[in-house]
C-alpha cells in the first residue's frame, strides 16, 4: 500500500483498516491522501483505487479527513461482478482529476444479474473534473456514480463534478443502467439522508449534463434530493435534472432541481429538462419540491420543466415548477406530457417566463398517442385532484390528439393565467382534439390571456363553484365551453370604447343552474350610454345555449354621467337578450346634484323669522337701531350634511308704526356627501320693513339679494371631479303675527309666514370637462307656528316656539354632457318638516338688548340637529 500525507495544520489521530477475507491491515495514525491503488481487496487491478471482484466482501474504515485523489481514467472505486460486497464504515472522500479521458468516482457492474454486486457507504463525497480532449473515444466523460446491475446503499451523498473538453463533454452525477442482454435484470441505488448533486459540462461541441440518469429498469430511492446541472456547448447543449428511461423508477422526498442549458450557435439548439421520464419509466417526488429549468442561446432553444413520454408516469407532491428561456426562437413547456403518459401533481405552481418574446409559451402541453385501440392508453394530466392545495399556473394549457387535462383550482390563492385550448397546436385532418376539464371553486380565478401564444380558449367542461373568470387583455379573447356545471361565479369580459369584445359561449344545454354574474372591464356606462347599447354589448359577448339552465346577469360599472347598469339576460346561442334593465345615477352626477341642493338649502336657511333677526323690536326706546347677529348650525338632507356660520348686521329707522332697515350678511358653510365635499358661501343685501300695530299685531316684509358660490370636489370610482360656480339668489318674505296676553306675564303669539326664493340658472364646466347647465330654481315656503312666552317685566322675555313648514317645491332641471354623452336630472326640494326651539330677549342696558335662541328641525327630509342664534341690538 502506498500513501502520501494530506497537508493539514492539525493532524488527527485515526485508524484506517482494510479488512478483506478476515485479514486486518496496519493502522494509520493521521489523515491521509491516497493517490495510488489502495491494496488489499483486489491487487490484480492496479488501475483502480479500490476494487472488489467475484465473491469478495471487503470493509474499509478511513480516518477522518482521508481522501482518495484519483487521476486515472479508470474508476476510483469499483464493485465488480457477482456476489461482491464493498463496505465503507466511515466517510468516503473521492477527488477526481482526469486528463483526456473518462472516469467515475464509483463504478459497479456484474456479469451475473441474479447476484449483483453490492456497495454500502456513508457520507460519500465525490468531487472532480475530467478535462482535455479525446477523439478516440469521442468524448470527455465523468460521472460521480456509474453503475450497471448493482445494489448500492449510501447514507448522505455529495457529488460535484465537471466535464470540460472536446469533442463531446458529458457529465453524469449518477448514471445507472445495465447491459442489454438481460431483459429481466433489476438494480437499485438507495440514498438515505440527503443527496446533493452538481454536474457541469462545458466547452464541447456537444455538451450533456445530468444530475441523475436512469436506464433500463434502474431503480433509485432518495430522501431529500438537491440537483444542479449546467450544459454549455459551442453547438448542441442538453441538460437534465433527472432522466429516466427504459422502465426505470426513481423515488425521492423533498427535491430541488435547477438546470440550465446554453448554446450561442444560432444554427444549433439548447435543451433543458428538469425531469424527463420516457419509455415506461416512473418518477415520484415529495411535497415542498422545486424545479427550475432555463435555456439560453441564439438558436432553437427548448425548455421543459417536466416531461413524461411514451407510457411513462410522473407523480409530484406540492411542487413549484418554473421553466424559462432567453431566446427569441425558443419554446417553453413547463409540463410536457405525451404518448400515453400520465402526470399527477398535488399542487404548487406551474409557471413559465417569457424573457425574449418566445414564440410559444405553455404551462401545460399534452399530446396523446395514436388512438389505435390495440395499444392506445390515455395521455392524462391531473392537477390537484381530490385535494385542496393551492395551485398557480402561468402560461397556456394545450391538449391535443385525445389527451386529457384535469385542472382543479379550489382555494382563494389558486389561479391560472393563460388560455386553455383543447384543439391543440398540432390538430389537423389526421388528429383529434383533446379534453380540458377545469374546476374553479372557493374564489379561485382564471385570467384568460392570449399573450403567451394561443389567443382563445376552448375546453370541454367548466365547473364553476364560486370561482371567477377574467377575460382581460389588449387582444380580444374568446372562450368556448362545451359544458358548464356548478353553482356559478364571476365573469369579467374586456371591451373597448366601441364595445368590441370577445365572447363567452356555452354550447350545450346543461341542467346545472349556475348563476354567473358578468361584468365588463375597459369600459364604463358612459361608453354604453343606454339600454340599447347594453343590449348590443350583451348579444356580442354572451352566447349561452338556449336550453341551458345557467343564469347570467350583467353589470357595467358607472361612468362620469351614466350610472351603473344592471340587467338579467335571456339565453340564446346566437347572443343573449336582456331584461329587467336598471340604470342608476352615477356617483358624480348624484354628488353634483347634492352639492347644488346644498346651495339652495343654505340660501333657504338664511330666511329668518322676525324674532330671530331682530329680537323683540317692541322693547326698543329709540327710533333708530343698529344690530348684529351670529347664527351657527347644521342641516342634513338626503345623507348630505352642511355646517355653516352666518353673520348679519343691519340698521333701521322708525317711521310711524314702521321700521325700515337694511342689512348685509355673510354665510360660509361646508357640505359633505359620501366622498364629495363642497364649500358654500353667500354675500347678501337685505331690505326690510316691519310694522308694529296695536293690540300686538305685527308684520314683517323682507327682500334679499345675494351672490352665491359653490366650490366642490367629488371622488368617484371613475375619477375625480372639481367644479365651481357663482350665481344669484333672491328672496321675498312676509310674516304676520299677533301677541295675545295670557295674564300679567304670559303671552301667546300665533304666526304665519310665506317666503319665495329663487336661485338663478348657471352654465359652467368642471375641471375634467363636464359641461353643466342649471335651470333657475324657485321655491315657495309656508310656515305656521307660535311662540309661548313669559315677560320679565321691562327686562325682556323667555319663550318656546314651534312651527310646521312646507316647501311647495318647484323642480329645476340640470343638463350635463361629456364626450358626447349627456344626461339630465331634476331637483325638487318639496318637503314638510317641523321646527321647535327656545329663546330669550334681555335688556342689557337702557339702549341695548341681547337676544338668543336654539332650535331644531325634524320630521322631514330636511333636518337641523342643532342651530343657535345670538344677537345684539342698540337703539338711539
Task: Please provide the spans of the model-predicted regions.
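Solvent-exposed, glycine/polar-rich loop segments of beta-barrel outer-membrane systems
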Residues: 591-594, 643, 670, 674-676, ...
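Outer-envelope beta-barrel architecture signal
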Residues: 414, 622-626, 645, 656-660, ...
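Outer membrane beta-barrel translocator domains of Type V secretion systems
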Residues: 585-748, 854-855, 860
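Extracellular beta-strand/beta-solenoid scaffold signature
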Residues: 39-53, 69-81, 95-117, 127-149, ...
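Extracellular beta-strand/loop-rich repeat segments of large surface/secreted proteins
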Residues: 365-382, 388-542
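Gram-negative bacterial Sec-dependent N-terminal signal peptides
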Residues: 1-31
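Outer membrane beta-barrel transmembrane domains
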Residues: 686-691, 773-876
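Outer-membrane translocation/initiation segment of Type V secreted surface proteins
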Residues: 32-33, 487-507, 514-652
Amino acid at each position: 500500500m502506498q500513501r502520501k500525507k494530506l497537508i493539514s495544520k492539525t493532524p488527527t489521530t485515526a485508524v484506517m483498516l482494510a479488512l478483506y477475507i478476515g485479514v486486518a491491515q496496519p493502522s494509520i495514525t493521521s489523515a491521509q491522501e491516497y493517490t495510488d491503488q489502495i491494496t488489499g481487496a483486489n491487487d490484480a487491478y492496479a488501475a483502480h483505487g479500490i476494487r472488489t471482484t467475484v465473491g469478495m466482501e471487503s470493509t474499509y474504515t478511513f480516518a477522518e479527513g482521508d481522501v482518495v485523489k484519483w487521476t486515472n481514467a479508470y474508476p476510483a472505486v469499483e464493485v465488480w461482478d457477482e456476489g461482491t460486497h464493498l463496505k465503507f464504515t466511515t466517510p468516503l472522500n473521492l477527488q477526481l482529476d482526469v486528463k483526456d479521458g473518462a472516469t467515475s468516482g464509483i463504478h459497479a457492474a456484474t456479469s451475473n444479474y441474479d447476484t449483483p454486486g453490492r456497495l454500502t457507504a456513508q457520507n460519500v463525497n465525490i468531487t472532480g473534473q475530467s478535462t482535455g480532449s479525446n477523439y478516440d473515444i469521442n468524448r470527455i466523460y465523468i460521472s460521480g456514480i456509474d453503475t450497471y446491475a448493482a445494489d448500492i446503499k449510501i447514507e448522505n451523498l455529495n457529488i460535484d463534478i465537471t466535464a470540460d473538453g472536446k469533442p463531446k463533454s458529458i457529465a453524469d452525477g449518477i448514471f445507472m443502467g445495465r447491459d442489454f442482454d438481460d431483459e429481466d435484470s433489476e438494480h437499485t441505488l438507495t440514498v438515505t439522508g440527503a443527496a446533493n448533486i452538481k454536474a457541469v459540462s462545458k466547452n464541447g461541441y456537444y455538451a450533456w449534463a445530468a444530475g441523475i440518469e436512469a436506464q433500463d429498469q434502474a431503480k433509485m430511492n432518495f430522501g431529500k434530493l438537491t440537483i444542479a446541472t449546467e450544459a454549455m456547448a459551442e453547438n448542441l447543449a442538453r441538460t437534465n435534472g433527472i432522466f429516466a428511461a427504459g422502465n426505470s423508477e426513481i423515488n425521492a422526498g423533498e427535491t430541488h432541481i435547477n438546470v440550465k442549458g446554453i448554446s450561442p450557435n444560432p444554427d444549433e439548439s439548447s435543451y433543458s429538462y428538469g425531469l424527463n421520464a420516457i419509455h415506461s419509466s416512473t418518477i415520484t417526488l415529495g411535497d415542498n419540491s422545486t424545479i427550475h429549468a432555463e435555456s439560453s442561446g441564439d438558436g432553437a432553444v427548448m425548455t421543459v420543466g417536466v416531461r413524461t413520454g411514451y407510457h411513462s408516469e410522473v407523480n409530484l407532491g406540492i411542487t413549484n415548477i418554473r421553466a424559462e428561456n432567453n431566446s427569441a426562437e425558443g419554446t417553453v413547456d413547463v409540463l410536457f406530457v405525451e404518448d400515453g403518459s400520465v402526470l399527477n401533481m398535488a399542487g404548487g405552481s406551474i409557471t413559465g417566463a417569457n424573457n425574449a418574446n418566445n414564440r410559444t409559451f405553455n404551462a401545460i402541453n399534452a399530446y396523446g398517442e395514436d388512438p389505435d385501440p390495440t395499444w392506445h392508453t390515455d395521455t392524462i394530466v391531473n392537477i390537484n385532484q381530490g385535494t385542496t392545495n393551492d395551485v398557480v399556473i402561468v402560461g397556456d394549457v394545450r391538449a391535443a390528439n385525445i389527451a386529457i387535462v384535469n385542472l382543479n383550482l379550489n382555494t382563494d390563492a389558486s389561479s391560472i393565467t393563460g388560455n386553455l385550448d383543447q384543439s391543440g397546436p398540432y390538430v389537423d385532418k389526421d388528429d383529434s382534439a383533446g379534453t380540458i376539464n377545469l374546476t374553479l371553486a372557493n374564489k379561485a380565478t382564471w385570467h384568460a390571456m392570449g399573450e403567451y401564444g394561443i389567443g382563445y380558449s376552448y375546453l370541454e367542461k367548466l365547473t364553476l363553484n364560486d370561482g371567477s373568470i377574467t377575460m382581460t387583455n389588449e387582444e380580444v379573447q374568446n372562450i368556448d365551453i362545451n359544458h358548464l356545471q356548478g353553482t356559478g361565479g364571476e365573469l369579467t369580459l374586456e371591451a373597448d370604447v366601441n364595445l368590441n369584445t370577445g365572447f363567452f359561449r356555452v354550447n350545450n344545454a346543461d341542467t346545472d343552474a349556475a348563476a354567473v354574474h358578468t361584468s365588463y372591464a375597459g369600459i364604463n356606462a358612459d361608453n354604453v350610454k343606454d339600454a340599447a347599447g347594453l343590449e348590443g354589448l350583451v348579444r356580442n359577448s354572451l352566447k349561452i345555449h338556449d336550453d341551458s339552465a345557467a343564469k347570467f346577469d350583467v353589470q357595467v360599472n358607472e361612468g362620469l354621467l351614466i350610472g351603473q347598469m344592471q340587467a338579467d339576460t335571456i339565453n340564446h346561442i346566437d347572443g343573449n337578450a336582456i331584461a329587467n334593465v336598471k340604470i342608476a345615477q352615477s356617483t358624480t352626477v348624484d354628488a353634483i346634484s347634492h352639492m347644488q341642493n346644498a346651495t339652495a338649502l343654505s340660501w333657504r336657511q338664511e330666511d329668518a323669522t322676525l324674532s330671530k333677526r331682530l329680537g323683540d323690536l317692541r322693547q326698543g326706546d329709540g327710533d333708530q337701531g343698529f344690530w348684529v347677529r351670529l347664527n351657527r348650525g347644521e342641516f342634513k338632507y338626503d345623507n348630505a350634511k352642511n355646517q355653516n356660520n352666518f353673520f348679519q348686521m343691519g340698521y333701521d329707522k322708525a317711521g310711524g308704526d314702521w321700521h325700515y332697515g337694511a342689512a348685509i350678511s355673510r354665510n360660509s358653510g361646508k357640505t359633505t356627501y359620501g366622498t364629495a365635499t363642497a364649500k358654500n358661501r353667500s354675500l347678501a343685501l337685505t331690505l326690510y320693513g316691519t310694522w308694529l300695530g296695536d293690540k300686538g299685531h305685527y308684520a314683517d316684509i323682507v327682500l334679499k339679494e345675494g351672490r352665491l358660490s359653490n366650490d366642490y370636489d367629488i371622488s368617484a370610482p371613475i375619477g375625480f371631479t372639481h367644479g365651481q360656480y357663482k350665481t344669484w339668489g333672491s328672496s321675498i318674505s312676509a310674516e304676520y303675527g299677533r301677541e295675545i296676553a295670557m295674564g300679567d306675564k304670559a303671552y301667546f303669539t300665533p304666526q304665519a309666514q310665506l317666503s319665495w326664493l329663487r336661485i338663478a340658472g348657471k352654465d359652467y364646466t368642471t375641471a375634467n370637462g363636464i359641461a353643466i347647465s342649471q335651470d333657475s330654481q324657485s321655491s315657495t315656503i309656508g310656515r305656521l307656528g307660535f311662540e309661548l312666552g313669559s315677560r320679565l317685566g321691562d327686562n325682556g322675555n323667555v319663550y318656546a316656539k314651534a312651527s310646521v313648514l312646507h316647501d311647495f317645491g318647484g323642480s329645476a332641471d340640470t343638463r350635463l354632457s361629456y364626450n358626447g354623452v349627456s344626461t339630465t336630472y331634476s331637483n325638487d326640494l318639496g318637503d314638510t318638516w317641523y321646527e321647535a326651539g327656545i329663546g330669550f330677549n334681555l335688556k342689557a342696558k337702557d339702549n341695548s338688548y341681547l337676544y338668543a335662541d336654539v332650535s331644531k328641525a325634524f320630521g322631514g327630509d330636511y333636518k337641523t340637529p342643532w342651530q343657535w342664534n345670538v344677537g345684539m341690538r342698540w337703539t338711539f
